[in-house]
Amino acid sequence: MPLISIQNAFLAFSDLEILKNAVLYINKKERISLIGKNGAGKSTLLKVINKNQELDHGSIIYQKNIKISYLKQDNPKNLDISIYDFIKNQLKKENNKEININTIVEIKKIIKTFQIDKHSLLSELSGGSLRKVVLGSALLSQPDVLLLDEPTNHLDINTIAWLEKFLKKFSGTTLFISHDRSFIQNLCTRIIDLDRGKLTSFPGDYKEFIKLKKENNRIEKTKKKLFDQHLEKEEIWIRKGIKARTTRNEGRVRNLKVLRKEYKNYKKIENFNNVIINEIKNYSGKIIFKLKNISFFIEKKTIIQSFSSIIQYGDKIGLIGNNGSGKSTMIKILMGEKKIQKGSIHFGTKLNIAYFDQDRSTLDSNKSILENVNNGREKIVLNGKEQHLIGYLKKFLFKPNQMKCLVKNLSGGECNRLLLAKLFLKPSNVLILDEPTNDLDLDTLELLENIIIKYSGTVLIVSHDRNFIENTVNKYWIFKGDGLINTHFSSHNNIIKEKNKKIQKKYVLNPIKSNISFLKTKQNQVKKELKKVLNEIEKIENSIKTLKIQMNEPDFFKQHIKNQLPIVKQFNIEEKKLEKILIYWENLEKKL
């Protein structure tokens, strides 16, 4: 017998159908991934299963004495409580009884795993740490069915890996919503697709699901095309009038009425269509940012320690590290919102930065969708072409009747789609994206990936979505903690493998001290050489700058060619020198 059975379920809010004659069986020890577009009703379905939302029609049957634990997408509102007391209170509420000594031990153990002080207040925690605590309380209640709504949001990569291992060992059933494709692929035993009110079951292989889903959509579009052709033919027939009134043709008239009803109820497959970004091409210089021995501290804590790097036009850099390791701080430094205490930053010329803020601070929750984008003006200009704002927003799957909807009434995914619509409208040659994948459905993720891949400017991304990072960047800044940042040119998967090997070797090998000192000496030599190279780069750039000033003089090209040539030749020589030395600098960084 299934743990939970949903039969002939109907649920609608106004004209939006969430469930339409839906059927679902949830069995023991399953790990089910619930997939669907933003606004399809995934979170609502979890609320139905958790008895927070009633069905309009249909039935839901639970196995006797079943225990369900539910991790919501939103964090708790009361934050003036210690971590330990919060988890203890949640468990009391779940179990309806006092906590025993074994549970206290388990609470302390899980808090230790998350590396957080148990006496800290929830209000003192970062978004990621708070998510860990809420997650911990849900896991400790030992339910038969665990409902998780976007459990990986705000979690760092190490914690996501820990969660995967935990859920694989978990003896109960898990039903989860997630946009993290690696998490889905590694974990689920079955996929449930919620699409236009229907629930369809697929085998638990995400890559195979994508193939099957695309094939299903292709077949559906073909059927719809044939249906439309048949309906059109019948409409032409009925308009002829006289023949349709005969008794013999009454059945055909009735069939036409059925076809019209089917057409009215039909919900088409919605996909992003021709979304482009307002890109300024070849407008900035080759060097976007040059960081030289930069350091940043908060009181006595080192966030960034003596970091040097050159970001060139076209670089796509992924910022990876645990929560609190300094990724968002680095973004704010590059945005000019925070000042470094040591070192220097050179900002490139004519930079136009488009910034995706994970806190959505650029959206006014009390204004409508239209008012938030382009200040509500009807026309927009995208890559030099004028178009209607409503037509532009429809490409991001916003319907015309939603345009006056207030942002505070939108789902998390809809807010992020709106933020992307606003971001792509801004003319840019640099994209800075701080956790852009949170709350996005899988189709929107794919759209964002494709846009970043095609974008010819510079991109910096903070994300814990392993697939997203792997598919979009060509260089990594690995934030180690204690201010240390390493640059890698390998793929993210290789970085993780390398890290795991090092952890294993740490407990197996006992390297000879002389080898360690040799490696340190070699590393110090590379660091010295890097300093020399950075100084040389600075000299060449200053030389290019001086030559440019001379060449930009109004009368420069009016003078005799003999006077022009030496300066133009020298300019070309310096440009080539800069190209070569930048390649040498990148190779040196790889050796660190």
Swiss-Prot record:
Q: What's its top-level EC category? A: hydrolase
Pfam families in the record, alphabetically?
Answer: ABC_tran, ABC_tran_Xtn
Residue runs in coiled coils: 516-550
Its Enzyme Commission number(s) read 3.6.1.-
Localization: Cytoplasm
Q: Which residues bind ATP 1?
A: 36-43
Please list the GO biological process terms of this entry: DNA repair
Grouped into one coarse class, the protein's main location is: cytoplasm
> Domain ABC transporter, which positions?
1-221, 289-516
- Single GO term (MF): ribosome binding
Give the binding site residues for ATP 2.
Answer: 321-328
UniProt KW keywords: ATP-binding, Coiled coil, Cytoplasm, DNA damage, DNA repair, DNA-binding, Hydrolase, Nucleotide-binding, Repeat
Query: Reaction catalysed?
Result: ATP + H2O = ADP + phosphate + H(+)
DNA damage as UniProt keyword: yes
- The set of disulfide-linked cysteines is none
InterPro entries according to UniProt? AAA+_ATPase (IPR003593), ABC_tran_Xtn (IPR032781), ABC_transporter-like_ATP-bd (IPR003439), ABC_transporter-like_CS (IPR017871), ABCF_ATPase (IPR051309), P-loop_NTPase (IPR027417), Uup (IPR043686), Val-tRNA_synth_C_sf (IPR037118)
Cellular component annotations (GO), alphabetically ordered: cytoplasm
Q: Which segments carry the region annotation C-terminal domain (CTD), binds DNA?
A: 518-592
Q: Describe the family membership recorded for this protein in Swiss-Prot or TrEMBL.
A: Belongs to the ABC transporter superfamily. ABCF family. Uup subfamily.
Tell me, what does this protein do in biology? Probably plays a role in ribosome assembly or function. May be involved in resolution of branched DNA intermediates that result from template switching in postreplication gaps. Binds DNA and has ATPase activity.
Instruction: Read off the PANTHER family from this record.
Output: ABC TRANSPORTER ATP-BINDING SUBUNIT, ABC TRANSPORTER DOMAIN-CONTAINING PROTEIN
Domains (record comment): The C-terminal domain (CTD) helps bind DNA.
- Give the protein's recorded name: ATP-binding protein Uup
Which species is this record about? Buchnera aphidicola subsp. Schizaphis graminum (strain Sg)
